[in-house]
Each structure stands twice: as C-alpha cells, then as structure tokens.
C-alpha cells in the first residue's frame, strides 16, 4: 500500500517514458508531463497506464471543449444527445458516395444492417423526431424491405409513407398533394383513394381494384351562385363525338332555379337539342321514341322502330313495328306488327281487334282459372261507394274454384238485347241485405219477404191454375191474399183479404168445413164459399156460398192460362218486359244456360262479373270457383279481365297488367309521344335484378330490360338496344358479339355492300370481359384527344401535345462572372408578341467563404411578353445580395431581346437551368464557356426590370420590413418566448404583450410602458401581471385578474368550478344557457346519468334522514308589499336507515307556520300532490299504464282500454282497442250487447201528452215477420252474430213511430226499432184478439 509520500506524483518530461516497476510502489502515481499520461502499479507488480489514450472505462460524465477526432469505431451504448443549436455534419465524399451499382454493399454516414434480422414483423427506425403529441421516424419494415416515413401520435394512431423496392411510393390513408406543379409519369399511377385535380390528362384510367362502394369518378362541384345566378346552375360532365364533323353529345348535371335537379344528354356544338333527361325524383324523358329488344342484324337501320306504322313518338318492343304509338294528346295505340290492336284515350280503352280476357301461361294454348278470389276482369265500381263486397265488378271471378261474375254499383245493370236474356241454368237470386228472392227455372220463387208487384200481376198462358197457394206444411192455417187499407181517394179504407181454409183436420170442434173460400176486410168477411163434408153415403160435399152482404155483378169473370207458383215463377213461352227489369236481393242476378254450361251475371260487393258455371251445371250450378273472365268495377268503371290479369281503369287512364305478358313474334309495342317505360325503384320497391354484383350472372336474376342469350351460332351479334337515324342512314346499337362475349356499342352506316348498298362505316366500342375497353378511333374528353398513336393533345401544360412535351428539354449548364462587380450580358431571347415565357434558375452566388451561407443562393428570372407598348416584363426573384441583384432588357430587333444582370464580384461557378414556351427560344451567353466579361455600360434604350427579394432567414432573421407575413404552415419558435407584440414600437408609452411557454404553462404576459426614465421597458422582461395562462399538463386556463365578457357569452364544454364566492348573473335579462348535449337512453342508470346531466348538483354521500336538501330554486320579493317566497327543486330522505330519497318541488312563503306547498315524487312513480291537479289542456295519458289509443284519450289499467274523444261531442268507450259504447248529444250507442238485471224506461204519464190509439194493431202485427238472421256491425261488414227479430223497414211501414234513423260505427245511416213501441203494438193486437175470442166464444155459446 502506498504511503502518503508515495501518493505524490513522480514526474517525467521525456516523451514516451514509462516508469519502471522498481520505481513505483503499489498504488503510487507517476505522470509524464510531455505525453499527458498517468501510471501506477497494481498488486501484481504491473505498470498500468491510467490515461484515456490507453483505453479503459470512464464511469462519469465527460465535458469536452473543442473538436473530437476518432480514428476507430465509435460504439454507442446509450443515447447521443445533440444540444440545442448543435448538429451532426458529414463532409463531402462521405462513406458510400459513388455509383448506384455499388450502393447495396457500400455503407453510409448513418448505416443500419438488417440483413440478419429474423423477426419479419419488426419496424426498424433509423431517424426519429418527436414533437408535441406525435413522433415522425424514418426506417425499414423487415417483412417488406421497404423504407417508410412513419408517424404515430400519443393515442397510437399511425400513418406511414412507403418507398417500395419496386420503385413505388405509397401514402397510407392520406392524400398526395402537389400545390405548385404536376405529377408526371411515363408509367401508371395506382391510387387506392381519390385523385383530386382541376384536370387529369391520361391514356387510361383503370379502376379494377377499387373497393366496393367507391365511385369511378366524382364531380361534386362547389359552385355557389350569387343572387339569381342559380338559374345557370349547370355542371358540364362530358362532350363526345364519333368522328370529325359527327354529332356532338353533351352530358350535363343541372340544378337550376325553378326546375328539378337532373342529369341530361344533348346534341349540338353547344347545348342545342335535348335528347334525354333523368330527374332527381326518378322520372326520365326521351326526346322522341324508344325501341326495346328490336336490335337485329341490320343494326340501327331499323332497330329504332319503323316510323311508317309507329309515327314519330313511340315505344317499339321486340320488333320495329310493335309497341306503343302516340296518336295525339291523351291518345295512344297498342300496335302489333304494323296494326293497331287497341287505343287508349282519356275516357276509354278501345280494342281495335278481338279482345280476349283469360289466364294462360302459354299465350292462349291452355286456359286456367285466375287465382283464388281473383277475377279475370275487375271494374273499379266502388267509386260510387256502393258498399257491396269490395265495391268492384268482377268478371270471371274464381270463387272456390268456380267461375263467378259480380256486377256492383249504386246504379243499375241494363241488358238491352232484342231476344232478351237467358239465364242458364235457371237460377236467379236477388239479394238485398238479409232479404233475397230466388227464381228457379222450375217455376219456384223463394223469398225472405213477401213479393210485391208495384204495377200489378198479369198471368198469361194456357194453364187453368193461375195462382196456387199451397197449404203450409210446418204450421196450421192457410195463406191469405190481402189488400192493405189506404187513405187516398179511390182506396179501400180497411184491408181486404181473400183466404181459403178449412177445419177438417182440426183436432177437435167443428170439422165439417172441408174447403172455405173467404173474402173479407178488417171489419169482417164479405162472403165465403165452402164445401162441407159429404152427407152419409156421398163422396162429394155440397158447395155453400155465404155473402155477408149484397153481391153485385155486371158481367162474367174470365180466367185463361195457367199460373203455377210455389217458390218461383216459371214463364214457359218467354217473358217480355217493356220497362226496366230490376234484380235485387241476390248476387247472381241473371243466368244464361244450356245443359252443359251457364254464364251468370253477378254483382258481388262493388263489382259486376260475368262468370261461367262448371261443366254440366249450366242450369242450376253455382258460379265457377276460379274463373272470372270479366269484372266491371261499379264504383269506378274499371274493367278487369282474367281475374284482374288485365285491368283497364278509365278514370285514371291506367291499364294494369297483373300477369306475365308476351308480344308474339312479328308484333311490337310502340310508345307514343312523351310516353316512357318507368322501372320503379324505391326504398319499398325492389326492381328485377337489384342485388349484389356476384348475383348478376344468375339466369333467375333479371333486370327491367333483360335478354338471355342461349345460341350456338357464335358469329352472331345480338343487340338489346338500337337507335336508327333514318336521314343519316346510320344506326347505333347496344349488344353482345357471341363469338367473344364482349359487350359493345356498335355503329353502322350505309348498307351491307350488297343489296342494301355500299357500307360507309362499321365501328364498335367494346367492353371486354377482361375489363378493358377498346375504341375504334381516338378518344376525345372535352378538348383533350387521346389518339390511336398514343399521343395526348388538346390538354393544358404538358398535355397540350404530349409528344411535344416529351421532346422538349430543360437545358442546364454552367456560367461564370468575373471578379468585377457590374452588369453582364446574360442571355438573348426571342419571345413572340403573341405571348411567350422564358424562365431561368441560377444556383450559386458571389464568393467562396466558409459559413457564408448567403453565397449559396438561388435566383430565378421570368421573362414574359407584354403589350401596349411592345416589350417584355422581366422579373428577378432572388434571396440574397450575393446573387444576381438587378435585371435589364434591351430590344434588339422585332421579338429579340438581350438580357443583362447585375452581380457582385466572383459570381462564378453558377448552375443555370432554363426553359421556354414552345414559341420562344433562348441563348445563354457564355453557357459552359468560361468567365464572362463585365459590360462597360448598358445600351441606350434599355429597360430595368423588377427585382423581388423572397423572404428567407439566410441572415439569421426574417427581414420582412413592413410586409405582411402570411403562412399556411406552422409558426415554430424554438424558444420559451415565442412572440412579442409592441403597441407603438420603441416610442414613449409603448408596451408589449409576450407569448411565453416555460414548459409548465403557456402565458400571455405584459411589460411596463416605455417612459422617459425607462425607455426600453417594452423590450425588457414582463412585469408581475399574469393575465392569462394555460397549464400544459392538464390544459386548464387561468384568468388571474378577472374575466370581462362583453359579448357572445361564455360557453363551457367541461365543468365550471367556483371554489369560493358566488356566481352572479348581472341583471334579470341575464341567463345560463346549456347548449345541445348527446341523447341518453332510458336504460342509463344514475351513475351513467351523472356525467350526462346538463346542470348537475353532486350532493355526494347524502344522509337518508328526513332532512330536506334543496338543489336549485328562485327567490322573489314583491316590493314593499312583502310576499317573499321561494320556488325550489330538492330532495328528502325517507327517514329510514336504507331506502330511496324522494324528489321535492316546493313553493315556500315568508310565514314560518304556513304558506308552503310540496309535491313529492317517489321511485315507484307516485306523485304526492298537496292540492288538486288542473289540466286545462293535455293529450292522451294513461292511468297506471301507457296510452295506446292516441288522440284525446285516457286509458285505464292497460294501454288500449279507456275513454277517447273522437270528434265534437263524441265520447267513445274502448275495450282492447274495440269501440263498445258512444256518448253524444242525442242517442247513446252501444256496439255490443247490454246485459242488465232489468231495464226501466221512463214512462210516467206526466211526461206524455197527445195520446192516440194504435189502430188496426192486429193487422199491423200480421204484416210483420219474425225472422232469424245473421247481423253485421255495420253496412257492408261481415256477420258477427245470429239474432231473432223483425226488420226495421217492415215495422216502419206499419208503425213509423217505432223506427228511428241513426248511424252505424262507420257512419252509415241505419234504422233502429223501439222495443217499447213494439210492446205497445203487441198489447193492442192482443186486445183485438181477445175481443175476437170473446166474440167467437159468445157465438159458440
């Protein structure tokens, strides 16, 4: 171990000298002052060199002043930090400099070798820069071997720019913007996103790899028209033609004032003739005609329809002479193979050929029934609200597989044929409501009501038994013929009856009267004739005639012919009806029949039908279950054929086809003027073929216009759309060439080089199956032409003529001035007066001094033709005084000018680049020719140009003078003080505002004002004020001397915390406004809602005692009169250890013992109200339920049971959405049965007056019929129950006071009957019977 003496250094001044081991003890130090080295001896006796030059480890920091030079490798374990203002500089000809071919093996000043990397997913950055919240880096992704510029922010959002090994450059997720020039490439430009440019000049745009949902092109212009300028709101999209001098087609999008937005196509040099338009509501217009499926081998010669049969405006379908043809306004024809087959007019559908309605899937080869409950022909007769069924007339209606016909309407059905009408089989049923009358061919007439003959009854024919009244089989007694009494002149006062009866079959009493013929009236019989039982030994009883009065006769009674009636009337020899024949009470009103088939004229609901019967059911069979050949709507006159497969609606001039349609070969459909085919496509209507791209080749996925090509003749061209221009003897078509499967637009002009004449043109624009497009000639895009030689002309810039652009070069060379300051002749240019431009770029400067950066400058010269007077504008753009400083020009002859520049001495070794417009030329004086001499003086007549200094910081600052500085990029100040703004320069009274960022906070600070004593205060430090600060860690803003907001208010997006004092609104007009917040769901709980409530009072761990905690309120004091009060919102606990708190709304006065009202809201929805609830006006609400009735209603218990006001004075009761009762001013309505223990009707005599007896009560009762019937809730509705009762119309005839008119649930007028009135009628009838019984009893006794 070294002693204290040994710790002292042993010294040596000899270079290279090292102490011997014997000279030093262990740990003793020796120093060589010449070599600056230190030595010691270790415990093994070895001399150790402790200096840095010998290597070793340094565990502390090293601070070095001066240069650092190292010959070997520099291995860096930790980071290397370049302090502010420092940099890493590499001298010229650094490692790796040389040819391209050696760069794979050569290293570089910064070199990373990733050749041994095994993790292919790694990204290896080599340069990285972090700023604010994001980091940029330059590195390599091993899996790609690509060089990437990468950006990632503190949230992990990542973007990158990739330089690929194939020479490509990829931008991830952003755009590639070129603001000062263009992107020029001899190869392809592949863009996965959008390319946005004022103009794109190219050969092909290929979008094969675009993602689903992306557009090929986008032209969403941002035009804004001031004033009324929108009348010219047009976006010009495309202009094309097929050849020079050919038709020019324009495609435009327009949004003009007063018009619908549309896209349209025009012809002409300008927008002269409109061909087609597609409006934003889906409507499409064609100028003339439309041909569909007419393309044949002669292409557009005849494929656009034939004007001979079709006229000028038509829709041709399938062939040139078939389709829809416009005749005149409101009139068009259906044309088939040159012939009109039907005319559609505003008031009719006229068949000009045979009309046949039926259902067939093979064009009439086989006929089938229409669908169940469907008709072949339906007429919309429900327009007159006839309430019969659906109100329509149906012909050929499939009812249960049988063909029926329904004729409906409030009018009448007239049949006016000279030979009358035959119903076969002979069944005719007339139905009205619950009544019906049925007529059978066997003579039977069956009727619910008695048959009434308004104009008498005449029986003709040979049968002697004209009228036969059969004895009832289900009841005692016989039938009576009755003449009712009347009150007019010539009418019988009492009813008169004729009846036949007898008592032979009575159970007891007199049974001798076998046959009695009796004539009587309401006061007794007039006479009767009777045959009594034969006397013993005789078989025929005698005839007795009794007249209850006199018998007067002046002639004879003659009866001829036979009338037989049971339940029908048979007319064997024809029936002649001179007046109107009415059929009512039955749906099947008329039958024409033979033994095999019958046809029935049927009215069903609101339709009239002509329906056949099934085979072999002609006379009495029902309508066919499915066939409905003809239907006429009784309400709208629409005619439906084939179970509405074809419907003609004359009211709306609309023909509806509800089945597949076929136009047979050589026929056509022609569209007339202004007609079109509209393929509907809306959110609810899905057109044929709509779906995915991958489904389009499915033969079952069709389209509004569809052709399925299934041919083997591969040389055939199959067009699907064709247009022929007759005057131009040319045709355009759209179709497929089978041999290639390519879809093409084809143009043919002239004939076939044979019988039709010479061929003039035959061109095809091919959309090929490999995705390519082939044009037969050049492609013109507005003024730009892509020629067949690959050249692009007519564009702007480089694409005015691409070949010329590629042939033109930018010339580069060297230029040198002398050591003398002065003017030099720089160039000679020729610029035509018709406008030309010459540009120069000069790199370099004057002098060669190290770190004189302004000597490495750039100057640019722009020369451009000027007129009036003749000359050129010469502008020199420089960046320092050590470049070209001034410029002058001299016109030497015509359009030739000499150019002079003024520069400093030693302005040499410059690089000059120059170019010119196509019509100009340039010669640089002394280019690559050695040092140029200074000129003695500028020539007389020269013109000094403009010199513009470009703003730069080559001298350390941006010396902009008094110019404004405008930047679109970031303004970065790498200093804590970023900006100082003085109020008045360095003058007295001026002060400054300073923007400062000390890393912890950002401040806006203020200095003191300049004074006479302190004249530089505005340039000094800030004073003690801290008016504004932003905490850089949490973003909080500090206002340390108050905040005055004089306009605009204070908008707070986050929270506003007031830690002390009150927040006061200035006056009564001040208010707190909370702007819109995001919506919250009802499922959000209180913890979620805490962050969503606009005005939030967080009471924290609130006690559940019965203490009251106000949240928000208002205080008012009504002047000197007192009335101090508060209006508050708060809550109160329930007073228990656990439980929900209740919400409180309270209004409180200034009296300690009262003047208080509290409304309490609990968690179960209960409202505890201290007083009554007044609802002056409210909508629907529910009691213990939601409200499903809507309108003005209250529901109870469930959402569709309650009370609803359905109109003025109308209050309805609903049960499960069904209306069961109505209260109104007048009658009360019950739509269901009323069950009650008893019903009491007010009948107090004190309420009654003007008493009158019910006369002839028994006769009135005998005119009534008790019937069993099915009853509906409203007229036209389905029967809902079976009842027994009487018919109101019949009761009205005998006792009008018992019948009252009211409305059903649909508002239809209906008749109701009074049970009380019926009881009164029956009481009087019983009294009459009782009197007669007593009379008979007295006679018998």
UniProtKB/Swiss-Prot annotation:
It comes from the Viruses. GO terms for cellular component: virus tail, fiber. One of its GO terms (biological process) is virion attachment to host cell. Residues 1243-1340 form the Peptidase S74 domain. Pfam families: Gp34_trimer (PF21446), Peptidase_S74 (PF13884). Keywords: Host-virus interaction, Viral attachment to host cell, Viral tail fiber protein, Viral tail protein, Virion, Virus entry into host cell. Proteolytic cleavage and release of the chaperone in the host cytosol stabilizes the folded protein. Residues 1238-1241 are annotated as: Interaction with the receptor-recognizing protein gp38. Transmembrane segments: none annotated. InterPro entries: Gp34_trimer, S74_ICA. The record marks 1243-1244 as: Cleavage. Homotrimer. Interacts with the receptor-recognizing protein Gp38. This is Long tail fiber protein Gp37. The gene is 37.
